[in-house]
Design a protein with these regions (language model features):
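Short active-site-adjacent helix-start/loop capping segments
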Residues: 116-118, 166-168, 210-212
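Conserved catalytic cores of soluble enzyme domains
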Residues: 204-334, 338, 342
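Intrinsic-disorder-associated, low-complexity terminal segments enriched in Asp/Asn/His/Tyr and depleted
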Residues: 3, 12, 19-21, 26
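Terminal peptide-recognition signature
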Residues: 61, 102, 158, 205, ...
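Glycine-rich beta-alpha loop segments
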Residues: 99, 128, 138-140, 146, ...
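Aromatic (phenylalanine/tyrosine) cluster motif
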Residues: 8-10, 14
């Protein structure tokens, strides 16, 4: 169906790939235009070796290794010692680089075109996977994949975003941006899991929910809100892991659980850095500044107690060794389910509710700030006192009470 604001059809995107002149770029919705640019221009700024912009020094060292190996093969000279030395340099440089990635570099790794997706992880760590389709209401949203399977000794319901591997699949799946039907599909499968007493495992990897008019007309915000409410009271263990991008309500729609974890180089944010920059600075060029301000990396979110655990990735990111990343993810899920299945459903619900109520920290200050708070309405003072976590800041802090 055509987009009601632009007259754009998804079929047009296939034509644009073959010949961009057939479908003018100004007829494409902005978010699809960006995705199309990713497909046609060598996704996410990577070169032929899959290196990102900030990884260029590593690419140079790897090229040296390739040249030495080629010279050794052609001339027959023994260059093994030199190759070992350069490989050691590559390993050291990689460790140093990935020990302290900034927020924007983390976003680039999370979006790497070779990064494993939900179907990849399901294929590597889940046995007897049986996919389930449809929301029993309107249609089957391919941006969300659901199904029963076994992981370790546990039978589970698996739910996750599916961005797609090739161009055709990415377009069919809207690059992992789910419509309302996707979230209703996920909820229907969660309720099915609850009926059979089976734990739910959610793998989050989306830039956000689909932002089209059709999705709004069919109640995308309502669908996500209902999922938040229903996931909070599911009577089975729920484990959620951000495996790549965790964008806004699109991620939250399957992100309420007893355990919430992130891969080391994933990000989890209220908005994409480009979206934030467009709002605050009226230009996506400030995306790096926005990324730093949003505090959405795994380390920062763990410090804020917004997530429970950080899952280590192979050196260089999950795309460098998908099997090792899958092994780490499988271990975390199996151990989490082992612990959660020992807890009675009533206790599980109380803990989950308590966990949700304690999200966020409230900062208070003394002196002039205390006087300012005292001058507020009684209801406001009571709300401040009921804050789940109170951090007393130094007297030199700004004289305001804010929610972080």
């Amino acid at each position: 169906m055509p987009d009601r604001t632009t007259g754009f059809r998804f079929q047009d995107t296939f034509l644009a790939i073959e010949d961009p002149n057939i479908v003018p770029s100004d007829r494409m919705p902005g978010i699809l235009r960006k995705c199309m640019s990713t497909i046609t221009n060598g996704s996410n700024g990577t070169n032929g070796g899959g290196y990102l912009e900030f990884e260029r020094p590593l690419a140079k060292i790897e090229k040296q290794i390739e040249e030495l190996e080629s010279t050794q093969a052609v001339t027959g000279r023994d260059l093994s010692e030199m190759i070992r030395t350069v490989r050691s340099e590559l390993l050291t440089a990689k460790r140093k680089l990935y020990a302290d990635l900034n927020a924007w570099e983390t976003v680039q790794v999370a979006r790497h075109p070779r990064r494993p997706l939900t179907p990849d992880y399901l294929g590597m760590m889940v046995r007897d996977f049986c996919e389930l389709h449809g929301d029993r209401n309107f249609r089957d949203d391919r941006a969300i994949i659901t199904g029963f399977g076994r992981i370790g000794p546990h039978k589970c319901m698996f739910i996750g975003h599916n961005k797609g591997k090739d161009t055709k699949e990415r377009l069919e799946n809207c690059f992992g941006m789910a419509h309302p039907e996707g979230y209703r599909k996920a909820l229907a499968k969660m309720k099915l899991a609850e009926k059979f007493g089976v734990p739910v495992v959610c793998l989050i990897d989306t830039a956000g929910a689909y932002p089209g008019i059709g999705a709004e007309e069919r109640g995308i915000a309502y669908a996500i809100a209902v999922n938040l409410m229903e996931m909070a009271r599911l009577k089975v263990p729920v484990v959620c892991v951000v495996i790549g991008e965790g964008g806004s309500g699109g991620a939250l729609g399957i992100g309420v659980g007893d355990r919430v974890a992130m891969f080391e180089h994933a990000y989890y944010s209220v908005i994409s850095p480009e979206g934030c920059a467009a709002i605050l600075w009226k230009s996506a060029e400030h995306a790096q500044t926005a990324a730093k301000a949003l505090k959405f990396t795994s380390k920062e979110l763990r410090k804020l107690n917004l997530i429970d655990d950080v899952i280590k990735e192979p050196l260089g990111g999950a795309h460098r060794d998908p099997a090792a990343a899958a092994a780490s993810l499988e271990k975390y899920i199996v151990e989490s389910l082992r612990d959660l299945k020992r807890v009675k459903p009533e206790t599980l619900l109380k803990r989950r509710y308590k966990r949700l109520r304690e999200l966020g920290s409230f900062f208070t200050v003394e002196g002039a700030a205390a006087a300012k708070i005292s001058a507020t309405k009684p209801r406001t003072r009571a709300a401040i006192k009921r804050a789940p976590k109170v951090i007393v800041a130094p007297a030199t802090a700004r004289p305001v009470a804010i929610e972080a």
